[in-house]
């Protein structure tokens, strides 16, 4: 689903943004991307329940060799899954980044059972016979502790980008016992060291307490892979890293249509 004709943010006057360095000292100025909505009611987002389900699969058998058969397989399966009426943020080709995964699907809804239904439907579909679950994580939007105006990109009107990186994390045991002021300071510095230099990278942080082995699940989106690498790399140089017990596995891939994904897979 890559769209190289998407309108891009305007570069700062007098500055060559044709190749943005990963470790620029200068912070880039915030901007609005024309692809994104600007009329989102943030209070309404915070006052409702919003769930996300990230599901990762591996291909366990080659898809049919005939093109018409593959297209019918994917089309009918996707139609069956769509009856769950959840929002699909994207299908992502994660092949090659890891040896254990080929597909990641990101879905959104205010009802976790509908997200489960979509997952069940895919497993029960014709395409599902070729897929085996590798990893999944459910997340719930909760208002940000220190800034309730900070909304996950996936709920804040931000259009999907061409690349996505998803990973869970667990805080240190002492993190939640630190004074609020100290945690606020640490997180502010963490944000400045990453997103202030990479404002084109959009983040969605959701709570996962009690829904998996993790406390949080994050999704970063950007138009190019190097921007995702850059923001993650930059944020390693912060005090917040001292308060992380786990932040793997990572699943990263390009956004594609179901048909595109199928055309890239091995064939019988």
What are these model-derived regions, one by one?
Residues 2-82, 110-115, 134-196, 209, ...:
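Short S/T/G/P-rich N-terminal loop/turn motif that feeds into the first structured element of a domain
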Residues 50-52, 101-103, 162-164, 214-217:
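Short, surface-exposed beta-edge/turn micro-motifs
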Residues 57-58, 93-94, 104-110, 119-121, ...:
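A structural feature that tracks compact, well-ordered secondary-structure segments
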Residues 59-63, 99-104:
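Glycine-/proline-rich flexible loop or hinge segments
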Residues 96-97, 114, 127-129, 156-158:
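Short, charge-rich binding segments
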